[in-house]
């Protein structure tokens, strides 16, 4: 089997999309290899080294994030591939240009949220950031704590950040967020539109 032959701990096709012509397309596929078994997979180990296009993608791999660097200037962080894809599509819909796909995954703790923001802030192409979290496993108050911790690392916020929290403990998260440093929107549409405007203002 594919997983046993390659020492894979996970094989996933996600997301699957339906095109306007009703064709089904596997938009992304991921195979995670057990790092402790790479000595048995020299070809895969070499491919892993070659697959990193830059330091950000290498760092994302170390953090365990699903990350793809794009050519735009609006940084996108979310929890869940579908949610991030929706945010990416809305950025494009409202006239912006996505800078990345960054999925922090379910149940992300404050440390991982801090790592995600640090990554996006480190991208010189990013002019603004939209952070979209729908709480389930990932609690809104935990995410808010992580955002505040990340922001505390900077003497001044390097790029404008718009946050949208919904779902589990979202109200508590909204109260925790330092709104002196970031902007908060209740709906995803409003958050994306503000992030796109922020990016436009930076580039003017």
Regions found by a protein language model. Give the residues of each.
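Short basic/hydrophobic patches in alpha-helices and adjacent helix-turn junctions
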Residues: 119-122, 149-153
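ATP-dependent carboxylate/acyl-activation modules
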Residues: 1-13, 17-131, 143, 166-204
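Short Gly/Thr/Asp-enriched flexible loops that form oxyanion-binding sites at enzyme active sites
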Residues: 139-150
